[in-house]
């Protein structure tokens, strides 16, 4: 054999003899190197079962004979080291497959990702043209990364992994998105991408800007956190009303007042724009101006100031037509915005679904906003969550409450009867006061109270009747939300009854003034005729026209109606502010500073702090808006005054509610949709339209004031414009459309369409309710399945724990069994282990057990391991030599 082959054989023998890690761990003891090799060569053939008597005999025999001549301490150390090595080897064997799999998975992922990134990076860096397949691959990867960026928030990953994946995806998109523009359209693609990013950023900034521009948002949120959503709903409604009135003010101010002031005839040029001679002395007195007389009466705030010229100024602006169309637009825009708001609220309330399930769980685990970084905001959020819990508790208590239904019905009937008596009495009182004021208007010297008796009585009724209604409503025992609706309806009936009583009495005054205007009209014509035709014989120059202040004029009933609505608005505003100042602020100051020196607890007893009157304030706002809609046609400046009133009311009432009021004793949640307020407002809008439509269509305008003077009816300006400014065929079309034979069928068709849509809406709502019940039933079934499954898992885990505890007890008892046997037992084991050729005396002790002491135990295999461990026992062969036999 050549030397090279010998060297290869030697290397092979060395490599074959080189022990593995597993073999070295088993051969850790000084004397078991040969045993490890024999254990590998001789597998377990007919090895005894664990726990059998044969195995115990072999363990004891090998243990005693193999350790003769060694000290017990060395044996124990070797046994402990052997056990530790075997345990570590088993752990490595178990953990190695998992580690190998993870390593393979990571390497595969790197190999899959590495070629793409390197190829893309090289192609992008070198600037080479990409093929269509590569472009498609890049586009696909970029789209996937973009999709991951948009959906990473919904992934069920830990936050660290989300951030890592998000950064990697953003870096990938920024790096390789430009590779798509390497062809002809590189600059165009880069420009489009830049503009798209800038547009997204602009929309985001604009949305943030719109959110910041919402007026009084933080004030309302602060109020909601302390007083609940029911009080905040009033301020949201007030803000909405302010926006509507701001639009109406823009229409009237921009299309009526400004054109008349800039292009119309100046003040003092005609009688309707001049203060009469008899009123000039006291025209600037405060008492006169407070009553909207003097110079205010003959200003652009009222109907009578505007001229009846068909066109004014160099623009030939048609002011009468603009005045009429703006009046129609006020009602049209208000009707459209109210119905649109109601529709949006209805859609929002139906899209929410059934949120009554798990109310407290949802509030507990999903109420907090983790983006809050301000301590004050956190305090407000804490108070808001507490208030929402109180609202839900009240709803839960009211849904489970039971009582005597017969007593409740009797008390509710009694309460409604008392409130009906109050409504009838207030209506009669207002009618009586208006009739009395007509008598006072004929007198010369009247007091301030007699001049303003109507406004004072109506304001006092609006101030004292709502608390009286609230006291009577305590008998009905309604849910707070239902009680609020009843209270709103009753106060609405009070205000509406008072308003229509006032209008009926005012219409009597209007008819009286119309009859007087005919006389004044004749007197004016004869006066001017005599003035111009009575000239002396020696006069050669004609007389100049009379001064506008000296011309007789009529009563101008439109301006009188506008003045009455202006007085009502201002007096209602002042009474509201005085009520807040005296009834809330001064009351709160008295309770706070006099409580420590009073006979009883002022905070807990009488008078205590005031609660915010939601129903009274809401109905006052709606009632005031109804007066604005009716009076704006006769007083264009009334909308501007109402805008100032709403603006000051927002700040004044926000300050009052935060400084002087306390939350309601029973805090309740407002309705999901604000449609109850909107429904009342829509009804007021319709009822406000009726008097204005009656005056426009039926009553003749004043002959010497206003843009419609000289016409039989106010709507004649529409016919005049159509005849003079439009082609004739359009006039025929408008005349055909105004035919009652066409209008009545159109109205009937509208009613049929409304009925059909209402029936469809009800059927859809019923289907929605049925689907909601089915979803609830499926949820209950799923919950029951989960509970049954959870119980089964708990039962199985308990059984497993019991079985494992029993096994552990058995193992513990086996380990703690004594190893000191009687001499006869040890001798019997030694005989069986040594074979038939070894003799021993009966009753004598074996020489190998001379060192055996209590507490020592023979080596055993691990009972908890999954694989059988090889152990070596020492015995004697039939020839008498010591041999080693593996036992698996």
Swiss-Prot record:
Signal peptide: none annotated. Inner ear and testis. Expressed in cochlear inner and outer hair cells and vestibular organ hair cells. It is found in: Cell membrane. Residues 1-228, 351-406, 476-479, 595-613, 661-674, 776-888 are cytoplasmic. Residues 1-128, 813-888 are annotated as: Disordered. Residues 267-317, 438-447, 515-556, 635-637, 699-741 are extracellular. GO terms for biological process: calcium ion transmembrane transport; detection of mechanical stimulus involved in sensory perception of sound; regulation of calcium ion transmembrane transport; vestibular reflex. It catalyses: Ca(2+)(in) = Ca(2+)(out). GO terms for cellular component: cuticular plate; plasma membrane; stereocilium; stereocilium tip. It comes from the Eukaryota. Keywords: Cell membrane, Ion channel, Ion transport, Membrane, Transmembrane, Transmembrane helix, Transport. Residues 117-128, 836-851, 866-881 have a biased composition (Polar residues). Disruption phenotype: Knockout mice show reduced transduction current amplitudes in inner hair cells relative to wild-type. The chain crosses the membrane at residues 229-266, 318-350, 407-437, 448-475, 480-514, 557-594, 614-634, 638-660, 675-698, 742-775. Residues 7-16, 32-44, 87-110 have a biased composition (Basic and acidic residues). GO terms for molecular function: calcium channel activity; mechanosensitive monoatomic ion channel activity; voltage-gated calcium channel activity. It is a multi-pass membrane protein. InterPro entries: TMC (IPR038900), TMC_dom (IPR012496). Forms the MET channel composed of TMC dimer (TMC1 or TMC2), TMIE, TOMT, CIB (CIB2 or CIB3), LHFPL5 and PDH15. The interaction of TMC1 and TMC2 with TOMT is required for the transportation of TMC1/2 into the stereocilia of hair cells. Interacts (via N-terminus) with both isoforms CD1 and CD3 of PCDH15. Can form a heterodimer with TMC1, TMC5 or TMC7. Pore-forming subunit of the mechanotransducer (MET) non-selective cation channel complex located at the tips of stereocilia of cochlear hair cells and that mediates sensory transduction in the auditory system. The MET complex is composed of two dimeric pore-forming ion-conducting transmembrane TMC (TMC1 or TMC2) subunits, several auxiliary proteins including LHFPL5, TMIE, CIB2/3 and TOMT, the tip-link PCDH15, and possibly the PIEZO subunits. Belongs to the TMC family. This is Transmembrane channel-like protein 2. The lineage of its organism: Eukaryota, Metazoa, Chordata, Craniata, Vertebrata.
């Amino acid at each position: 054999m050549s030397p090279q082959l010998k060297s290869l054989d030697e290397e092979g023998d060395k490599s074959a003899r080189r022990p593995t890690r597993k073999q070295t761990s088993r051969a850790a003891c000084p004397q078991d190197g040969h045993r490890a090799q024999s254990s590998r060569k001789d597998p377990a053939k007919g090895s005894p079962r664990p726990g059998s008597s044969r195995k115990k005999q072999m363990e004891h025999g090998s243990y005693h004979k193999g350790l003769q001549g060694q000290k017990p301490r060395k044996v124990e150390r070797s046994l402990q080291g052997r056990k530790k090595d075997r345990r570590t080897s088993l752990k490595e064997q178990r953990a190695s497959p998992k580690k190998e799999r993870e390593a393979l998975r990571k390497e595969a992922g790197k190999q899959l990702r590495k070629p793409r990134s390197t190829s893309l990076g090289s192609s992008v860096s070198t600037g080479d043209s990409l093929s269509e397949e590569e472009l498609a691959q890049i586009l696909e990867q970029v789209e996937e990364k973009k999709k991951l960026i948009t959906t990473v928030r919904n992934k069920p990953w830990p936050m660290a992994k989300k951030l890592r994946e998000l950064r990697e995806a953003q870096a990938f998109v920024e790096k390789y998105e430009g590779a798509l523009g390497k062809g002809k359209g590189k600059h165009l693609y880069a420009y489009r991408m830049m503009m798209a990013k800038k547009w997204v950023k602009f929309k985001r900034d604009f949305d943030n800007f719109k959110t910041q521009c919402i007026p009084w948002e933080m004030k309302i949120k602060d109020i909601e956190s302390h007083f609940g959503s029911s009080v905040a709903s009033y301020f949201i409604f007030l803000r909405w009303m302010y926006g509507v009135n701001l639009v109406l003010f823009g229409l009237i101010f921009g299309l009526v007042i400004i054109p008349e002031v800039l292009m119309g005839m100046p003040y003092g040029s005609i009688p309707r724009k001049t203060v009469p001679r008899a009123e000039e002395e006291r025209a600037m007195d405060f008492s006169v101006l407070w009553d909207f007389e003097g110079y205010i009466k003959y200003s652009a705030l009222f109907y009578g100031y505007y001229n009846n010229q068909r066109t004014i100024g160099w623009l030939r602006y048609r002011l009468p037509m603009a005045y009429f169309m703006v009046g129609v637009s006020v009602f049209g825009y208000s009707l459209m915005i109210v119905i649109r708001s109601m529709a949006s609220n209805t859609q929002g309330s139906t899209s929410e679904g059934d949120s009554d399930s798990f109310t407290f769980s949802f509030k507990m685990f999903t109420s907090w906003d983790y983006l809050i970084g301000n301590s004050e905001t956190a305090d407000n959020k804490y108070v808001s969550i507490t208030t929402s819990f109180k609202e839900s508790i009240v709803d839960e208590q009211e849904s489970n409450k039971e009582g005597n239904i017969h007593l409740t019905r009797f008390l509710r009937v009694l309460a409604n009867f008392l409130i009906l008596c109050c409504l009838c009495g207030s209506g009669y009182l207002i009618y009586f006061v208006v009739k009395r004021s007509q008598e006072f208007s004929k007198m010369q010297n009247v007091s301030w109270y007699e001049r303003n008796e109507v406004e004072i009585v109506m304001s006092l009724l609006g101030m004292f009747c709502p608390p009286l209604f609230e006291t009577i409503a305590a008998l009905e025992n309604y849910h707070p939300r239902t009680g609020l609706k009843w209270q709103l309806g009753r106060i609405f009936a009070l205000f509406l009854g008072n308003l229509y009583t006032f209008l009926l009495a005012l219409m009597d005054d209007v008819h009286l003034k119309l009859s007087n205007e005919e006389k004044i009209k004749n007197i004016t014509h004869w006066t001017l005729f005599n003035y111009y035709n009575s000239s002396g014989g020696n006069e050669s120059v004609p007389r100049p026209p009379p001064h506008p202040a000296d011309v007789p004029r009529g009563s101008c009933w439109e301006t009188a109606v506008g003045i009455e609505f202006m007085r009502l608005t201002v007096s209602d505003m002042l009474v509201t502010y005085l009520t807040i100042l005296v009834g809330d602020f001064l009351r709160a100051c008295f309770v706070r500073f006099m409580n420590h020196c009073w006979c009883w607890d002022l905070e807990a007893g009488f008078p205590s702090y005031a609660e915010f009157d939601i129903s009274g304030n809401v109905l006052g706002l709606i009632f005031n808006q109804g007066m604005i809609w009716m009076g704006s046609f006769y007083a264009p400046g009334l909308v501007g005054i109402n805008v100032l009133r709403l603006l000051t009311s927002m700040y004044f009432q926000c300050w009052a509610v935060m400084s002087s009021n306390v939350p309601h004793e029973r805090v309740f949640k407002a309705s999901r949709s604000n449609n109850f307020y909107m429904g009342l407002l829509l009804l007021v809008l319709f009822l406000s339209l009726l008097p204005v439509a009656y005056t426009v269509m039926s009553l003749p305008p004043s002959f010497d004031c206003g843009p419609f003077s000289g016409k039989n009816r106010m709507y004649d300006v529409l016919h005049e414009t159509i005849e003079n400014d439009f082609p004739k065929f359009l006039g025929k079309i408008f005349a055909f459309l105004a035919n009652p034979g066409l209008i009545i069928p159109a109205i009937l068709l509208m009613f049929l369409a409304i009925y059909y849509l209402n029936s469809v809406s009800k059927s859809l709502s019923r289907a929605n309710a049925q689907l909601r019940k089915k979803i609830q039933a499926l949820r209950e079934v799923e919950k029951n399945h989960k509970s049954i499954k959870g119980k089964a898992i708990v039962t199985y885990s308990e059984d497993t724990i019991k079985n494992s505890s029993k096994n552990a007890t058995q193992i513990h008892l086996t380990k703690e069994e004594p190893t000191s046997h009687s001499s006869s037992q040890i001798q019997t084991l030694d005989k069986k282990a040594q074979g038939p050729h070894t003799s021993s005396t009966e009753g004598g002790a074996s020489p190998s057990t001379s060192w055996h002491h209590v507490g020592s135990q023979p080596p055993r295999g691990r009972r908890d391991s999954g694989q059988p461990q090889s152990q070596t026992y020492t015995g004697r062969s039939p020839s008498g030599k010591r041999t080693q036999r593996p036992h698996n």
